[in-house]
């Protein structure tokens, strides 16, 4: 009976819990903003008068690009427990992919003669996992206001000018101004 429990505990530690944890993290990263517990500001708008709703809609429409960026950033934020779960999964993967000391001693002679491509890929994956574990996430810089380029005002369509430009016919004024 004890042997069965020990094997079940080992199975859970090696296979069940890391996969369950990875599935929970993957599922929670795809949760939209409203389901993650953050209140939706559009749903909390003041409904007492139609004028306030129109003003709220106007301000939202005027800064639509900024609000879109804010909404996108908030929906993909990762809280502390998600970070902890991701680091745990990455740590499990790095231990699972790390070469064993005994295996390295036995295969040391064979590795000096030739390095298998799968071994190179495994080491590259380990480097990537290590970088993911030690990398501190910094959100991208937000550029709030940019100068708009002044474009020349185009004159309204005039058939005489079009004929002069396209057909080469002198049917309009000598110059535009």
From Swiss-Prot:
<keyword id="KW-0963">Cytoplasm</keyword>
<comment type="similarity">
    <text>Belongs to the SecM family.</text>
</comment>
<protein>
    <recommendedName>
        <fullName>Secretion monitor</fullName>
    </recommendedName>
</protein>
<comment type="function">
    <text>Regulates secA expression by translational coupling of the secM secA operon. Translational pausing at a specific Pro residue 5 residues before the end of the protein may allow disruption of a mRNA repressor helix that normally suppresses secA translation initiation.</text>
</comment>
<keyword id="KW-0574">Periplasm</keyword>
<dbReference type="GO" id="GO:0042597">
    <property type="term" value="C:periplasmic space"/>
</dbReference>
<keyword id="KW-0732">Signal</keyword>
<dbReference type="Pfam" id="PF06558">
    <property type="entry name" value="SecM"/>
</dbReference>
<dbReference type="GO" id="GO:0045182">
    <property type="term" value="F:translation regulator activity"/>
</dbReference>
<dbReference type="GO" id="GO:0005829">
    <property type="term" value="C:cytosol"/>
</dbReference>
<dbReference type="InterPro" id="IPR009502">
    <property type="entry name" value="SecM"/>
</dbReference>
<feature type="signal peptide">
    <location>
        <begin position="1"/>
        <end position="37"/>
    </location>
</feature>
